[in-house]
UniProtKB/Swiss-Prot annotation:
Biological role stated in the UniProt entry: Structural protein that crystallize inside the trichocyst matrix.
Protein name: Trichocyst matrix protein T2-A
Species this protein is from: Paramecium tetraurelia
Record's subcellular location: Trichocyst
Record keywords, A-Z: Coiled coil, Signal
Gene: T2A
Propeptide stretch(es), residue numbers: 20-48, 184-238
Highest taxon of source: Eukaryota
Residue runs in coiled coils: 51-154, 293-332
C-alpha cells in the first residue's frame, strides 16, 4: 500500500514538475531574446548536431553577462561617486553664495540703507536751512535797499527844500540891501516897499516850489509852507520897513537850521540802520556759511555712501546671479546623475533578465531536453507559438 502511495506521489510530483518546466519554456519564449535562443536550439536539434558547442556558447554568454555587469557596476559606482563630488561642490558653492548674500543684504538693510536715510534727511534739513538763511539775507538786503532809497528820497527832499528856502532868503536879502527898495535920503523909519517885479518874482518862486514839493513822498508839509510864503510874497510890497523883511530872512535862517538839523538826524538814523544791517547781515552770512558747509559735507558723505551702496548692490546682484547659475548647473548635473542611475538600473534589469533566460535555457538543455524538444516541436506546428 505504501508503495502505491509513494508511486502516486512521485507521479503527481513529476506532473507538477513537468508543468513548471512547460511554464518556464513558455515564459522564455515570450521574450525576443528567449525566442531567438529557442529558434537556435530548434535548428541545432533539427540538424542532429551535438549541443555541446551551443551549451558552451550559452555558458560563455552567461559568464560575459556576469563580467559586463561587474564592469557596469564599477563604472556606475565611479560615475555616481563623481556625481556625489560634483553635487557636494555645487552645494558648498551655493551655501557660500547664500551666506554672502545674507551678509550683503544684512549690510544693506541693517547699515547702509538706514545711514542713507539719515544722510538724506540731513541734506534735506541743511538745504532748508540754506534756503531759509538765503531768504532772510535777500529780505534783509531788499529791506536795506528800500530803506536806503527812502533815505535818499528824504535827503533829496531836504536838499530841495534847503535850496528853495535859501534861494528865497537870497532874494529877500539881496533886495533889502538894494537901493530900489529904500527911499534914499529919508529916515530909516520911513516905509520901504519892494517893487512889483521883485514881489512877483518871489511869489512865482514859492508857487513853483509849492507845486514841486507837493510831489514829495515824505515831507509833504513843505508844499503848504511854500504856499504860505507865496501869499506873503504877494503882499511883500506892503511891508512897512526893512525890519519886517529881516524877520522873514531870520525865519528862513531858522527853517534852514531846522532842515539842517533834521538832515543830520536823518543821516544819524541812517548810519544806525546801516550799522544794524551790517551786524544782522554778518550774522546771517555766518549762519548761511555754516549751513552751507554742513550741506556740502552731508552731500559729499551721501555721494560716497551711495557709491558704497552701488558697489554692495552690484555685488549682491552678482551673488544672486551666481546662485541662479550654480542652481541651474546643479539641477542639470543632478538630472544627469539621476538619468544615469535610471539607465544603469534599466541596463542591469535587462542584462539580468537576459542572463536569467540564458541560465534557465542552459538548465532546460541539460535537464529537460526531452520536454524542451517536444515543446519546440509543438511550437513549430502551432505556427511558432507554444
Amino acid at each position: 500500500m505504501k508503495t502505491v502511495i509513494l508511486a502516486l506521489a512521485l507521479i503527481v510530483l513529476a506532473s507538477s514538475t513537468q508543468a513548471d518546466v512547460i511554464a518556464t519554456i513558455k515564459k522564455i519564449d515570450q521574450s525576443p531574446f528567449g525566442r531567438t535562443l529557442f529558434d537556435t536550439i530548434y535548428l541545432e536539434l533539427q540538424t542532429g548536431d551535438p549541443l555541446d558547442r551551443l551549451l558552451s556558447t550559452l555558458t560563455d554568454l552567461e559568464d560575459r553577462y556576469v563580467a559586463e555587469q561587474k564592469e557596469d557596476d564599477a563604472k556606475n559606482q565611479e560615475y555616481q561617486g563623481a556625481c556625489t563630488v560634483d553635487i557636494s561642490a555645487f552645494d558648498k558653492d551655493l551655501a557660500e553664495s547664500n551666506r554672502k548674500k545674507i551678509e550683503l543684504e544684512a549690510r544693506l538693510e541693517g547699515q547702509l540703507y538706514p545711514q542713507r536715510s539719515i544722510l538724506e534727511g540731513l541734506v534735506a534739513q541743511k538745504k532748508a536751512e540754506v534756503k531759509g538763511y538765503q531768504k532772510d539775507l535777500d529780505e534783509l538786503d531788499a529791506q536795506r535797499a528800500e530803506e536806503h532809497e527812502d533815505f535818499e528820497e528824504k535827503v533829496l527832499e531836504h536838499q530841495e527844500a534847503t535850496a528853495i528856502i535859501a534861494e528865497a532868503r537870497r532874494l529877500f536879502a539881496d533886495n533889502i540891501e538894494h537901493g530900489s527898495f529904500i527911499q534914499k535920503g529919508k529916515a530909516t523909519k520911513q516905509t520901504h516897499k519892494f517893487t512889483k517885479e521883485v514881489a512877483s518874482m518871489i511869489q512865482k518862486h514859492f508857487t513853483t516850489s509849492a507845486k514841486k514839493t507837493a510831489k514829495f513822498q515824505h515831507r509833504k508839509g513843505y508844499s503848504k509852507l511854500f504856499k504860505a510864503f507865496a501869499t506873503i510874497a504877494s503882499k511883500v510890497e506892503q511891508l512897512a520897513d526893512a525890519g519886517a523883511v529881516q524877520k522873514i530872512i531870520d525865519l528862513a535862517d531858522e527853517l534852514l537850521a531846522k532842515i539842517a538839523d533834521s538832515l543830520s538826524l536823518l543821516r544819524f538814523a541812517e548810519d544806525k540802520r546801516v550799522e544794524a544791517y551790517k551786524k544782522s547781515r554778518n550774522f546771517i552770512v555766518i549762519s548761511l556759511n555754516v549751513a552751507g558747509s554742513a550741506l556740502a559735507n552731508a552731500t559729499s558723505d551721501l555721494a560716497s555712501l551711495n557709491d558704497i551702496i552701488a558697489q554692495v548692490e552690484a555685488s549682491l546682484d552678482t551673488t544672486e546671479q551666481r546662485i541662479e547659475n550654480v542652481s541651474a548647473d546643479r539641477h542639470d548635473r543632478f538630472t544627469q546623475c539621476e538619468e544615469a542611475v535610471q539607465d544603469y538600473q534599466d541596463a542591469r534589469a535587462a542584462r539580468t533578465s537576459d542572463r536569467d533566460v540564458v541560465s534557465q535555457t542552459i538548465g532546460l538543455v541539460n535537464k529537460e531536453l526531452r520536454t524542451l524538444r517536444e515543446q519546440l516541436a509543438l511550437r513549430q506546428q502551432a505556427g511558432e507559438e507554444i
